[in-house]
Regions:
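Rossmann-like NAD(P)H-binding beta-loop-alpha module
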Residues: 122-203, 210
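Substrate-binding/catalytic subdomain of NAD(P)-dependent oxidoreductase enzymes
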Residues: 180-278, 283-285
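A conserved regulatory-domain signal marking ACT and ACT-like small-molecule sensing domains
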Residues: 311, 316-428
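A short hydrophobic/small-residue beta-strand
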Residues: 101-103, 376
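Rossmann-fold NAD(P)-binding glycine/threonine-rich loop
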Residues: 83-98, 107-145
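Glycine-rich phosphate/pyrophosphate-binding beta-alpha loops
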Residues: 294-296, 300-306
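N-terminal glycine-/serine-/threonine-rich beta1-alpha1-beta2 phosphate-ribose binding loop
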Residues: 1-98
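General beta-strand structural signal in soluble alpha/beta enzymes
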Residues: 61-62, 78, 103-105, 128-132, ...
Length: 428
């Protein structure tokens, strides 16, 4: 058995404390499975006195994470402080330049700087690993870089933000409006400090960008991910979707087309009987479609102390075993800079708006759609007691750019009393 692998951890929040607990409680198990002992050597966090529910006795404390990253007595630097810039970025760069392996759960940083950090890791012949950055305890990164390495990936699809899935599930099961469930989720601590990272689809978009890079051999480009949040989803949308046999999910889809790499994260209607449609509460699900493997479905908790710290430990054990895999599954220099493209796959759409309750208004809306070559599959008008008539239209398949032109034309008419909300109906 070789010499101990020495670890330094920056960040002792929920995940960092969870990693310390696993290292303390499972030391013999880790040694037997990795072939060498793993020793937690040094730590760093904002508060030294805070009770984290685990003993920190015997550990060296660094008040400066940059100093921790450069210490000569650690082999692996674990970054768990977050943020898409410094000090996390500087600390990771310091560790890599010092010849240390790096493990991070920082999806925002990877989505923004992943390419340059991967190149730096390769230059210094060390590993940059991030299983915990995508979907918590689900081994999505390992599935792509290892288990499916012999496959051409046709499509990635999934629910990658548990908070949004919780909100949408709660709205449906409790018949509560978005604002009420949002406030409830905030009180439960489900939301990021900036809630729009969750509800705006940004957090999930970061994860999709990372997986896309691995699956399609491309440089990470988060700006190319079309993101739309769940803020405009109403209880009426939830009810209408249910009546038609659908559920609404914040759905990520990435696929290579003839035009380029298509990446989108947006609320969609999916079949209630599909695996994604049956996903409840704060769970995540990621589906990889490989040309030989077929459809691989991974489901599990996407956040929380246990699942995320488990993912960090997976990376630690990989390093202890000497497993060396390029950061994004292949040499960073071989990753292609792809032209981003808008969605080129046609789909049916759900449209909800309010129209003036007067003769001829539905005909005007149908004309605006027809002028753009969009046919109507069904139209629903709910009962109302005021001058505004709530209307739901489901179209036949069309391209999003065509739909957008039609929506602009609809808005220019004198019959709409609110901006239409359009949700894609995705075949899953």
């Amino acid at each position: 058995m070789g010499s101990a692998l020495k670890i330094g951890i920056a960040g002792l929040g929920t995940v960092g404390a969870g990693v310390v607990k696993i290292l303390r409680s499972h030391s013999r198990l880790i040694t037997s499975r990795s072939g060498k002992s793993v020793e937690l050597k040094a730590i760093s966090a904002r508060s030294r006195s805070k009770d984290r529910g685990v003993s920190l006795e015997g550990l060296s404390w660094e008040s400066d994470i940059i100093e921790l990253a450069g210490r000569s007595d650690i082999d692996v630097f674990v970054e768990l402080i977050g943020g898409d810039g410094n000090p996390a970025k500087e600390a990771i760069e310091t560790a890599l330049k010092s010849g240390k392996h790096v493990i991070t759960a920082n999806k925002a940083l990877l989505a923004k700087h992943g390419q340059e950090l991967a190149e730096l890791a390769e230059k210094n012949n060390v590993s940059l690993k991030f299983e915990a950055a995508v979907a918590g305890g689900i081994p999505a990164v390992k599935a792509l870089t290892e288990s499916l390495a012999g496959n051409k990936i046709n499509r990635i699809m999934g629910v990658m933000n548990g908070t949004c899935n919780y909100i949408l599930t709660r709205m449906e099961t409790s018949n509560l409006p978005y604002e009420t469930v949002f406030n409830e989720a905030q009180k439960l601590g489900y939301l990021e400090a900036d809630p729009t990272l969750d509800t705006g689809g940004i957090d999930a978009g970061h994860k999709l960008a990372i997986l896309s890079s691995i699956a399609f051999g491309t440089q990470i480009d988060f700006k190319a991910v079309v993101t739309q949040g769940i803020e405009l989803v109403s209880i009426q949308d939830i009810e209408q979707a249910r009546e038609m046999g659908y559920r609404i999910k914040l759905l990520g889809v990435s696929q290579m087309t003839d035009e380029g790499l298509e990446q989108r994260m947006q609320p969609c209607l999916v079949s209630a009987n599909s695996p994604i449609g049956q996903l409840e509460n704060a769970m995540n699900m990621i589906i990889f479609d490989g040309d030989h493997s077929g459809q691989i479905i991974l489901r599990g908790a996407g956040a929380g102390e246990g699942p995320t710290s488990s993912a960090v430990m997976s990376d630690i054990i990989d390093i202890a075993r000497g497993n060396k895999i390029p950061t994004f599954g292949q040499s960073a220099n071989s990753l292609i800079k792809m032209k981003p493209v808008l969605t080129s796959t046609p789909a049916a759409y759900y449209i909800r708006t309010k129209l003036e309750d007067s003769p001829g208004v539905l005909a005007k809306m149908a004309t605006a759609l027809g002028n753009n070559g969009i046919s109507i599959d069904q139209m629903r008008q709910t009962q109302h007691a005021d001058v505004a008539a709530p209307v739901v239209i489901v179209t036949h398949k069309t391209l999003p750019e065509t739909l957008n032109k039609a929506l602009i034309e609809i808005m220019k008419t004198d019959v709409t009393l609110e901006a239409p909300v359009a949700l894609r109906i995705e075949d899953v």
